[in-house]
Amino acid sequence: MKNRLTSLSSLVLILMGLSACQSVPPVAPPATDPASEAAAEPVITEQAQAPAPAVAEVPIPPESLLPLLHAEFLLRDRDLDAALEILTAEALRLDDPALTRRALRLAEFRQDDARALALAIKLSEQDSSDAAAAVTAMGLLIRAGEPEEALVFARTAKARGARINAPALLVSWDALEPDKRRAVATAVEALASDWPADQDIAIAVAYLRRAQEDPDRALAALEPVLSANPDEERALLLWSQIKLDSGAKRPFEKIRDAVARNPDNEALRLQFARLLASASELDEAREQFAALLTLSPRNGDYLFSLALIEIEANEPEAAKVNLQALLDLGQRPDEAQYYLGRVYENLEEYGAAIEAYDKVGPSREFFDATRRAAELRLDSGDTLDFRDGFRRTRARNPGQAEQLYGIEAELLREIDETELAIQVYTEALDLFPESMSLRYGRAMAHEALDDIPGMEGDLRAILKLEPNNATTLNALGYTLTVHTTRYQEAATLIERALELSPGEPAILDSLGWVYFKLGRLLQAVDLLKEAYALFPDAEVAAHLGEALWVSGREQDALVVWRASLEREPEAEHVTDTLLRLGVTLDTSVID
């Protein structure tokens, strides 16, 4: 019985919200996610929060009276989107800050970012004292992936006395083109120059310099922040991450000291625990999560994180205790049952593992739990129990029946029960006749049994429902190429697939191979070379090598085949081709 409990390091990071490879905010783990902060309520100073100065009442133009009155009635009738459309149009047309402010509040409430951005920009221009409007425009531009424009409003907001979430300005750094990066970097450094005491901006500068692979200057940007506030979470986490990046001996010293100074600060301790887990410091991470549970004994997130760490640390009995405690709390039941199943499977308690997996309901873990339970039943040799297990699962979860049929059939194919798999697909298609995935799966099962008419029938049924399905066009064309002599028909299908998915290596390979069959050798070689450059798979290598060989380019063919066998010595596509052509790799070719 094979051990299916693989390392959970990456899983721990994902489930705990960490990312070990990001170079800009959020770092692993961020004290506050810059992207979500950008969408949150603006953080502004008391000056910015103060009521806006009284302004003269703006008379309503006669042509706006009826639209605005209509908007009022729509608001009373709770037709908010229609009201927003009218209010936005009037606010952008008129010069009335009060109207713009009202429309902006409604746009934010309706989460209409496009209108909210236009209104925030308008309000910032209309009212030179409105810091919140500038902060809102900045946040919405960040969310839209426009940091250069956001920086303009960041500067405006600062000038009006607002506090800004400066690190969020770098959240899209990795996606920026080089010239955009230079512009953003210059603007962020300029903010720091103009507001040298601003801790948020200093942290943004540190993020920037880390992204620029300048760790010493990044740490230098953090030093004044930590000198003024040794417990600043974002600065502590970023400092630790930079130290980790550089392989420093004591990367956690500052945050560890801060936790010691603030033993009841759950947020700080949690970030420290997550940071330790991301660095695979599992023993200390476990201690920190245990301390968090002392502070909040009914916190299911802490229990779950602790259990994952115990699984990773090969402490299955401790993990079982904490996962059961999580179930007793009634929190995260599907995740708890799934990982209980993983633990039992690792302990070779397969009956208990199946029982736990069967209790996982619709969730992120559901389909993997179902697959694992089914594999364990198959490993026991009980095909009847395997099928009954799927019937019971479908009865409990009718909304997932289509996918469950697909998993059942796939697993049967994996153990060469292809005829039984076709029965499952057929039963499923009676219930879901328009399911592309089920019909495609049955087509592949027909091919495995050399039932080419059956395969062709299913693929053509898919194309009847979806004539521009490039995958199916390619599959049918390649099938006709390999199993029939209907090469021109096959070429037409594959050419259409390539029009729909240009540059797709599998389709390039198929088209090159059918052109080879048609005797169009120059075109075949060009297409197969392109496919091989994109995807140096053994099957593509076999095709390209044969096309080169038949074209008289024997030496080039040998180079391709040798390279493929060096990567995969048992590659059947290549070895079968060599055998069929009577070629050995030590063949001497005389030019």
Language-model features: locations:
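C-terminal motif of bacterial Sec signal peptides marking the signal peptidase cleavage site
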Residues: 17-20
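Alpha-solenoid helical repeat scaffolds
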Residues: 55-76, 83-591
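Bacterial N-terminal signal peptides that target proteins for export
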Residues: 1-10
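Post-signal peptide N-terminal segment of mature Sec-exported envelope proteins
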Residues: 27-62
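Bacterial signal peptide processing site
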Residues: 22-25
